Amino acid sequence: MVWLIGISFVQSEVVPSDPYATRETKALLQRLHAQVGRGVLIGHQDATAYGVGWKSESSRSDMKDVCGDYPAVYGWDLGDIDQDRNIDGVAFADIKRLIREADARGGINTLSMHLDHPVSGRNAWDNTKVVHQLLPGGAEHEGFLATLDLVAAFLADLKRDDGTFIPVVLRPYHEHSERWPWWGRTNCYEDEFIAL
């Protein structure tokens, strides 16, 4: 009986779907899995970039001002990755620095990608059908790959002082079940979205 009780406290290892996941990514997955059933992790978009009545103040966060601590989860956006600043007006160089700072505090970083419409050049909310043109053989495939190369370069630069990569939760096409984005459920077929 004691043995059975003892084994119930052993936490099973979660195996990532990516066989090439880094040790840091596996550790983040374990950390998230360990949180299940224990409570909620509070997150805040652009938490340390700007807030109510302030912008670019070192170590500042509205959540810290109000609650006394930083959020557990920090959200950032890669929209306008081909520019100096993202869609929220935060410089990408600052985002990298703030991701490193959040990671050093034990925070979890997430990255969404509100990429501009690849054909019209308008924002992500232009829901003109385009996904089929981004896939291999499509007219916009090469241009889309160039954008993804910018995303990859950004991610490759997210390293800790010891040179290890900072794990992030990448949410490239979030809210895909909605109608508003060009990648949304009414703007492409399921197989196109999966291929994307």
Q: Language-model features: where?
A:
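A generic structural signal for short, solvent-exposed coil/turn residues
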Residues: 4, 34, 66, 101-103, ...
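Bacterial Sec-dependent signal peptides at the C-terminal "C-region" and cleavage site
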Residues: 4-16
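N-terminal module-boundary/linker segments of secreted carbohydrate-active enzymes
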Residues: 13-73, 79, 88-89
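Substrate-binding cleft of extracellular glycoside hydrolase catalytic domains
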Residues: 79-195
